[in-house]
Amino acid sequence: MTRHTPNRRARTWLGAGALLTTGALALTACGSGFNDTPGEGHASGGGTLRLLIGSSGDAETKAVTDAVAAWSEQSGVQAEVQTANDLPQQLSQGFAAGSPPDLFYLAPEALAGYAANGSIAAYGDDLANKDDFYPSLVDNFTVDGKFYCAPKDFSTLALIINTDLWSAAGLTDADVPTTWDQLASVAQKLTTDGRVGLAFGAEYQRIGAFMAEAGGGLVTDGKATADSSANVEALNYVKTHLNDGTFAFASDVGAGWGGEAFGTQKAAMVIEGNWITGAMSADYPGVKYQVAELPAGPGGKGTLQFTNCWGMAADSGNQDQARSLVEYLTSTDQQLAFSKAFGPMPSIQSAADAWSAANPDLTAFLSGAENAQFPPNMAGAADVITDFNAQLESLKTGDPQALLQTAQSNLEAITK
């Protein structure tokens, strides 16, 4: 996850965009990368280890910076952290200038492109803890049989319920929805003047959960399946309840994202990920809530899962030190510390029991991993999803089948 600010790109890609902040370590100047003179530099070697992260907010920045500082003191290797204000752009500029960071947050949808041009090192199989990562996360960062990079954490979507509003509507624990029909029913009971029953972002990264619950998805076994009947059913379900006023996009209730709609109580329920916990404690501490698994649809249970990895520059002269740092940052103790600080779930199986014990009210997020889909991660997928999101904004009045057929054509162009 993670405290997510009302920056849509940051919310959508779990840290791909970020606030520019200053941490405990010396942060390099922000701009086109790490080298002020484009073309002169190369990935550092034998000197300071450099990291570029896309942070969800101050809590994440401080946690990562402090962890890197602790490793630096322990290892004797200097390291510095830069927090990007536009991670994809700054990372691309760093590579173009010949001065990429040694380590950086890397989203799944960016992996294939960097792997294809040889920009990143495939170091996953060299990690001492490689067998501890969840297999589905390893798959997400594997290209052509090579495990490229260590998943740093992961998050899933769940149903977040305002418990005071729930009780006020006469609902009990027995009414927590487990089917689409039940979800529609409780959303109707929770909808009042000035408040919608259920809100979520007008984007695939939220609405895609309904597609998964219908038995659909954008890509199946490497083939584009956006225009499947299951996906049409999912979008029609969402459209129906957008029009009857019991569901709403966060933007339609004047909120920048689902967490804001929920925190300001413009929505009694939202579909969001782990990162909402940080926002609630920081910005809306008086709002009581519970987390439940998303209701099953015609295809059964389903949700979406998100992650980033620690990418490593192929030209880094500090690969041994960088790999050592990654092992430290993905260790059980450190991942549990990150989870406590800013909300994500550990990417390693050995931390699951401790995480569940420490977060008994959030276990629905972890349970969702059993039925979770990842957004497509092949080269070009990010652009396709951006276009799909633009069309989903008009779902309330649009033709679901037509929207999906456009997405199908775009996906076919990158999956052939």
Where are the predicted features?
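Hinge/lid segment of periplasmic solute-binding proteins
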Residues: 108-158, 184, 192, 286, ...
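A structural signal for short loop-to-beta-strand junctions that line the ligand-binding cleft
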Residues: 101-102, 130-166, 197, 300-301, ...
